[in-house]
């Protein structure tokens, strides 16, 4: 019985302590933090006070989070459409997401990354023909679309592919 009481007392952290503990593992958006704290059983008042504390001290900053997320996503070969969608799923406002993408991502970069991904997809295909078939072009286009590249960047990349 004593062990159970000690375990319960040990598990229940203050809302701020729980938030700071979770932030040790990485940056979070405001939405992610609120959801986490609700899941842990904290009430709305505690969460509101905690969020004000975290935002005031810049422990949570959706602008900073969005910029880092865009950088990492670009390195992974994701396009701006997918990046925007993923940021919005994480609770980052559309304006903040668009601003972060515009700051780090430009049209030239998108076209270059799309071409790199298309070339990688082409290397993975075992084709002996000199020209790309329509079927191969469609397969590459689907891959680029799934990665979040615009139609313009996709068509440009396919047009620039060398066989």
Predicted regions and their residues:
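An alpha-helical, amphipathic repeat domain used for nucleic-acid recognition
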Residues: 1-163
């Amino acid at each position: 019985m004593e062990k159970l009481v000690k375990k319960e007392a040990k598990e229940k952290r203050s809302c701020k302590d729980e938030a700071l503990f979770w932030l040790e593992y990485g940056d979070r958006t405001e939405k992610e933090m609120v959801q986490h704290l609700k899941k842990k059983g904290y009430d709305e008042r505690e969460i509101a006070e905690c969020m004000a504390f975290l935002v005031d001290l810049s422990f949570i900053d959706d602008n900073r989070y969005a910029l880092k997320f865009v950088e990492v996503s670009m390195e992974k070969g994701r396009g701006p459409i997918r990046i925007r969608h993923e940021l919005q799923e994480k609770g980052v406002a559309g304006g903040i997401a668009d601003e972060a993408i515009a700051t780090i991502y430009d049209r030239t970069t998108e076209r270059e990354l799309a071409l790199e991904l298309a070339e990688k997809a082409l290397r993975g295909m075992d084709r002996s023909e000199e020209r790309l078939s329509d079927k191969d072009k469609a397969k590459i286009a689907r891959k680029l679309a799934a990665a979040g590249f615009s139609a313009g960047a996709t068509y440009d990349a396919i047009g620039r592919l060398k066989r």
